[in-house]
Amino acid sequence: LFSGVYCIGMKDLAKDNNGYDKYQHFDSRLSFVHQIIVARKFGEQFSLEIAPWFVHYNQVDVITDLNDMYGVSAAMRFKFSKKFGVTGEYSYRINKYSRNDYYNSMGIGLELQTAGHIFQVLLTNSIGLAESQYLPYTNNRWTNAGIRLGFNIGRSFQL
């Protein structure tokens, strides 16, 4: 079970145009993410994860948008060898919560493990890093060159 609370720490850029700061109150900045993560490792090479999710925004941008969004994500990892593998994730949005065109989030990645590091190169159509950003608000498709490149380095160590 995973739950997260996120707080927006940015200025409302539309305030100069309309005179109203939508982030004036602290609780307007909060969003909540809840997931039930079910995962299994099938042998040494393949792992699979299914995660139904729920996102709630205390305040949305447009009054016609819903505050609650839900869907389900699936992720996988396949290791070709002890050092090289491929990952993937797809998130399906179930309800129609906005008039804007948002798309399902999808990402693929390659990973290389060395003695103490894990290097990942990722391609995705999402912009946000946190679940409350990329699950409901992916506004690019793979078919219209809306692809983003990401890179992670992980270090494993023991105390």
Name the predicted role of every residue range.
Residues F26-F32, L66-V72, Y102-M106, Q113-A115, ...:
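Residues that define the transmembrane beta-barrel architecture of outer-membrane proteins
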Residues L1-N67, Y134-N144:
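Outer-membrane pore/translocation modules
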Residues E49-S91:
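A mid-sequence, solvent-exposed acidic-amphipathic segment
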Residues S81-K83, Y90-A115:
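Surface-exposed substrate-engagement region within the catalytic domains
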Residues L1-S3, H34, I50-P52, M76, ...:
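Membrane-embedded beta-strand positions of outer-membrane beta-barrel proteins
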Residues F2-Y6, W53-V55, S91-R93, T124-S126, ...:
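Outer-membrane beta-barrel pore domains and translocons
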Residues Q45-L48, K82-G88, G116-Q120, F157-L159:
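Repeated loop/turn-to-beta-strand initiation elements of outer-membrane beta-barrel proteins
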Residues I108-H117, V121, S126-G128, N144-L159:
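Outer-membrane beta-barrel "beta-signal"
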